[in-house]
């Protein structure tokens, strides 16, 4: 039987780079909130132990796709611990709405949805903590999607504290470029010494993103998108880009601005939510 699973976007409401470790990874402080908008995964269990991705992604080999890697990882770990029913497999297809290299967490969200959905469908019985640990091996942003609650993140993004920021409306705009994360993090001018602050202090400050100055400098499309949005509302970059977003108190205000978006901007309106749509599905 075919099942349908949300794979929501996230926004980084703020993002501060606090240092760089010896292994090259950057330490940060960021605030994750989900959107009621994203991809949808369609999963049909198989009984022959096979994993098939029915909707290949351009320029990504199926076996390298995070969806397939997440499914195989869960299969391996559940099997090794005696929790995988014989013959467990799946046909997986994706309805893709989130851009690659957009800073909305699309790939990480897809991986998390696969872990949560297949753990449920295969009845493996892994805990959320176990799934989050698996997710971290796939990417630093995967655990927040697995846990499914808005969170303050520290370390390299893996130390999560659940929080409940206001659930605002957002106009999210993709300026038509893809920004690989390493392009931003390897830039010598990226701020890497923002002082660490407590979550209580940060929530009282004006939010910003340390990556924004680099993204605007290196990608004129991002600069143009932010310049346009800032005419209407407080706006900033999410993650390492390329998407930017503006914050509104009401849906109608956000939609009024959306109607005026220039043709070169691919934009949508969505609500910030502190409980992931994926986890709402499981309640």
Swiss-Prot record:
* The reaction(s) this protein catalyses: 4-CDP-2-C-methyl-D-erythritol + ATP = 4-CDP-2-C-methyl-D-erythritol 2-phosphate + ADP + H(+)
The UniProt record lists the EC number as 2.7.1.148
InterPro entries, A to Z: GHMP_kinase_C_dom, GHMP_kinase_C_sf, GHMP_kinase_N_dom, IspE, Ribosomal_Su5_D2-typ_SF, Ribsml_uS5_D2-typ_fold_subgr
The subunit field of the Swiss-Prot or TrEMBL record says: Homodimer.
Q: What is this protein called?
A: 4-diphosphocytidyl-2-C-methyl-D-erythritol kinase
* Its job: Catalyzes the phosphorylation of the position 2 hydroxy group of 4-diphosphocytidyl-2C-methyl-D-erythritol.
Q: Quote any Pfam family the record assigns.
A: GHMP_kinases_N
Q: What family does this chain come from, according to its entry?
A: Belongs to the GHMP kinase family. IspE subfamily.
Active site positions, chain numbering: 10, 141
NCBIfam families from the entry? ispE
GO function term, MF aspect, one? ATP binding
- HAMAP family in the cross-refs: IspE (MF_00061)
Please provide the record's keywords in A-Z order: ATP-binding, Isoprene biosynthesis, Kinase, Nucleotide-binding, Transferase
What gene codes for this chain?
Answer: ispE
The positions annotated for binding ATP are: 99-109
Give the enzyme class. transferase
**Pathway assigned to this chain's UniProt record:** Isoprenoid biosynthesis; isopentenyl diphosphate biosynthesis via DXP pathway; isopentenyl diphosphate from 1-deoxy-D-xylulose 5-phosphate: step 3/6
One Gene Ontology term of the biological-process aspect is: terpenoid biosynthetic process
């Amino acid at each position: 039987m075919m099942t349908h699973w949300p794979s929501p976007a996230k926004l980084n409401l703020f993002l501060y780079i606090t240092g760089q470790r010896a292994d090259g990874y950057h330490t940060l402080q960021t605030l994750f909130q989900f959107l009621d908008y994203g991809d949808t995964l369609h999963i049909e269990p198989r009984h022959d132990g096979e994993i098939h991705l029915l909707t290949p992604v351009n320029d990504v080999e199926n076996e390298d796709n995070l969806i397939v890697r997440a499914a195989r990882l869960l299969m391996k770990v559940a099997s090794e611990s005696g929790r995988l029913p014989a013959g467990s497999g799946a046909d997986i297809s994706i309805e893709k709405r989130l851009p690659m290299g957009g800073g909305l967490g699309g790939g990480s969200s897809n991986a998390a949805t696969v872990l949560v959905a297949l753990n449920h469908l295969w009845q493996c019985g892994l805990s959320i903590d176990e799934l989050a640990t698996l997710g971290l091996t796939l990417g630093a942003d995967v655990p927040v999607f697995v846990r499914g609650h808005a969170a303050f993140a520290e370390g390299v993004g893996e130390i999560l504290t659940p929080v409940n920021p206001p659930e605002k409306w957002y106009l999210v705009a993709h300026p038509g470029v893809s920004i690989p994360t390493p392009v931003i993090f390897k830039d010598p001018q990226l701020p890497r010494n923002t002082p660490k602050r407590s979550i209580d202090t940060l929530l009282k400050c004006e939010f910003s993103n340390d990556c924004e100055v680099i993204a605007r400098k290196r990608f004129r499309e991002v600069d143009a998108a932010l310049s346009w949005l800032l005419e209407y509302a407080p706006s900033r970059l999410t993650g390492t880009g390329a998407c930017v977003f503006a914050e509104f108190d009401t849906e109608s205000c956000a939609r009024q601005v959306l109607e005026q978006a220039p043709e070169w901007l691919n934009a949508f309106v969505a609500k910030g939510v502190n409980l992931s749509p994926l986890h709402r599905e499981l309640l």
